[in-house]
From Swiss-Prot:
Molecular functions (GO terms): extracellular matrix binding
Record gene name: THSD1
Record's protein name: Thrombospondin type-1 domain-containing protein 1
Subunit structure: Part of a complex composed of THSD1, PTK2/FAK1, TLN1 and VCL. Interacts with TLN1.
Membrane-related topology note: Single-pass type I membrane protein
The species this protein was found in: Bos taurus
Amino acid sequence: MKQTLKDFSNLLLVVLCDYVLGEAEHLVLGEPGHVALSNSTVTVDFHGANGTLRNVSVLLVEASSNQTLTTKYLLTNQSQGTLEFECFYFKEAGDYWFVMTREATNSSLPVPPRERSAFLKVEWPVFHVDLSRTSMAAEGTFQVGLFTSQPLCPFPGDKPDILLEVTFTNSLPEARAGQALPLEIRASKRVELAQGQWVEFDCPPVGPEAYVTVTVVLKLLGRDSVIMSTGPIDLAQKFGYKLVMEPELTCEAGVEVTVLPPPCIFVQGVIAVFKEAPRLPGERTNRLAENSLALGERRTGFNCTLFDMGRNKYCFDFGVSSQSQFSAKEKECMLIRRSIETWGLWQPWSQCSASCGDGVRERRRVCLTSSPSRPGCPGMSSETSPCSLEDCAAFQPSSPSPLQPQAPVKSNNVVTVTGISLCLFIIVATVLITLWRKLGRAPKCSTPARHNSLHGPGCRKNSDEENICELSEPRGSFSDAGDGPAGSPGDPGIPLTYRRSVPAPPDDEASGSESFQANAQKIIPPLFSYRLAQQQLKEMKKKGLTETTKVYHVSQSPLTDTAIDAAATAAAAAAASPGGSESPEEAAAGKFRIKSPFLEHPPTVGAGDRPPSRLDHPFSAASCAVSPSQTLLRKSQVRSHSRGSHFRRTASFHEARQARPFRERSLSTLTPRPTPAHGPRARTWDQAGERGRPPSRGTALFPEKRDHGPGAAGASGPLSPLPKPHSLGPPPRKPDLGDRQAGFVGAGERPEPPRARRGPSPSHRSVSRKQPSPPAPKDGYQRVSPLSPSQGRKDKCQSFPAHPEFAFYDNTSFGLTEAEQRMLDLPGYFGSNEEDETTSTLSVEKLVI
């Protein structure tokens, strides 16, 4: 209004002056003001005096810079009119002058113009600035909006650019007194001039408080003009905090509350919960719980136990908590329904469904509710889980349990299957080895026995059991006690009488090689046991022992031959030699020889007069690979026995004990029996068995055979028959047992074919029990007693056989006392059953040492 009055006063002044001076030239603005960048034009009215205006122009001049923006010319002889100035001349706000000038045309000299002018005030358009969130997901940006209600001028050329500048601070200007320098971050973007637009800006890291100042700058050529500036704007107040939650929910485990902060602000504060209820004026709310949020944390939760049962309204406040007060920045309320249906505790797991291996176990829980008819507990009331017992004693079933869920194979199942397979393999291998040992063929005795050794090199000794090696020579007969040779060149003496059965016919070769267990080792007590005890005593003294145990086996099957130690044979041969003297070398060689306990010297027999006995040739020493205990154990598995298969005799000795005197047997009724004049079964020397054996003392009896005798290397040719021996000593006397033993020295030197090492077959063995030996030749001896074996054992003393042709023992030639017969009775000695026809039958078999 004041401006209008001023303009009006100026116009009146001009009119008065013109009137006084006689001139009426002036400029009149159509609008006193204008808006820059707007699309409206500026009009100017002009009036001339006397109606004559020639060469008149109107200039638009910017007052601040005194720069003429444009010039407009009036028509000739036009005294009045209106001029329009376009909007694009007014780009900036400020003061503008319209000046009218005139030039004289009737004079050659220019007439100084009388200027007339008008003043125009131009202002900036009004822009509105707004801030908004970019989106709920994009939390690090915000938008700045720039709007104006003024229509903008359509500039024909390049439009002027707008520079939008945003300044971030962490405090207000009035709060900066006494503090450190405030944080100030600037960001700007250049945009085109528009009536309205949104410009996006990124949020710098300011902190829990942020203030924004927005400045709009017009970019002109060479200079910047600030259109507007607003701020600082508190973003927390502008946007505010928001608590994101459901309007109503059923609390099962807890209530989760999320804080949505304003743009470019980090959350830091406290969330409090309280129950919405009517309160008296001035009554404070009772907060149930408070959860603090660290810098940058936006989410927290409250347990359902804070809320009451049923449906209630609870409010959550977010603010800054101090020691004195709590300033809430945001409040949000919601309805919370807490159900009384809830699950109880899980019951213990049930037992595994399988006793071993993989199984399933189960546990249950109960829904605690006020209405059992409609339980509303969410979730499962029972659950199952697999269970596995690794210490399963039985094998796992081939098909898995139907209750077992499908699962990958575990490492413990692989270990279990591997262990079971290994156990099965061991069991099958054990059974096969046992059957092979029981039914297979036993290994042959091929290694010759060493001299002066109780066990062959291939023999195995089980504990302290006596090793007795079998010989595989056909069974033959003994020679008479007085007719047998005392020794042969290189043959050691055998201190124990034994008999051999007649060889089996050729058709029995296969049956005899099928069974090795039937041809087992047996021992003839008691004299033989005494000699073994003597030999054992020597071994104990050599080893420094005072007590040991030997195991002897007795079986009802016929006795078999075994290897005879060369030392024992040499001892018997030395006893039969005249004078009984021996050289130091012979004494050293026969250090462990077993001598006869009957110290009677045998009759001297000439070497040239004595015919060879049927057993008067050497046999190769053999060593067995099967111990006596193993052989008899196999026989005891095949045939039943009234007693145990093992009989144990314990011999305790001491070096200080005195040897008891030998008991002599009465052999008054013994009569010498002739021997066949020739040996029908002469054998060749066994070079492998006799090689390496030192010459024995029996070599001195046959000096003419020294070159051909089987010494260390043995002999390869057969023995020639020797003439029948004649007595060279005193008149014939009744030979005792020692004579008989000396006479059977050469019986152990006969080699056997390998067939008999495996023993006769069961069929052949049964035949040998009934017919132990074939009948003797016509010039031989006839059977003394026709009694059966059982009756013979009951009535007669079972002593050594009188003749190899006799099938059963005949002791009529022995005059033994009743006590001696009881002592020497083998079934009574072993405690066997006399009624058993197969128990401890002493048939025409071989005797063993």
